[in-house]
């Protein structure tokens, strides 16, 4: 997967589905992580770019969060960060969120359900991205 740069921000993970580009960058949050409590926390920043000729609206999301042992946690919900953003053609929406793991490494992927032209539906894939602890010597992903 090729890195993507937008406004001088480097996104290591980027994918285009149906003319919608989803780009992701992550950050390990050492200050919120606690190995003694089996807690490792990451933030992720998502950039959604609408390269379609029509306006789209993000309706809901699906995440599959997998830790290094293969344990999977699935998350479904309306919108993102309490919003169901409307994204006009050639415009973008970005947000940041986070996720904890009970292991020091893992990865996430998923999809957004979007609508356009009133009620036509699009499934937009979120690229798989790595959640690796930079303090760990062995990187799995």
Show where each model-derived region lies:
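Beta-strand signatures of extracellular beta-sandwich domains
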Residues: 62-64
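Acidic, contiguous internal or C-terminal segments within carbohydrate-active enzymes
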Residues: 42-47
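Asparagine-centered strand-capping/turn motif at beta-strand->loop junctions
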Residues: 48-52
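Membrane engagement elements in two modes
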Residues: 1-41, 53-57, 66-141
């Amino acid at each position: 997967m090729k890195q993507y740069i937008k406004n001088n921000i480097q996104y290591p993970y980027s994918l285009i589905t149906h003319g919608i580009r989803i780009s992701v960058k992550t950050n390990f949050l050492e200050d919120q992580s606690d190995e003694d409590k089996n807690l490792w926390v990451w933030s992720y920043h998502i950039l959604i770019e609408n390269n379609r000729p029509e306006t789209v609206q993000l309706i809901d999301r699906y995440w599959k969060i997998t830790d290094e042992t293969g344990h999977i946690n699935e998350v479904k919900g309306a919108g993102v960060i309490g919003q169901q953003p409307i994204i006009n053609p050639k415009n973008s929406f970005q947000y940041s969120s986070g996720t904890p793991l009970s292991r020091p490494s893992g990865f996430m992927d998923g999809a957004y359900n979007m609508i356009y032209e009133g009620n036509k539906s699009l499934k937009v894939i979120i690229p798989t991205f790595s959640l690796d602890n930079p303090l760990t010597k062995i990187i799995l992903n």
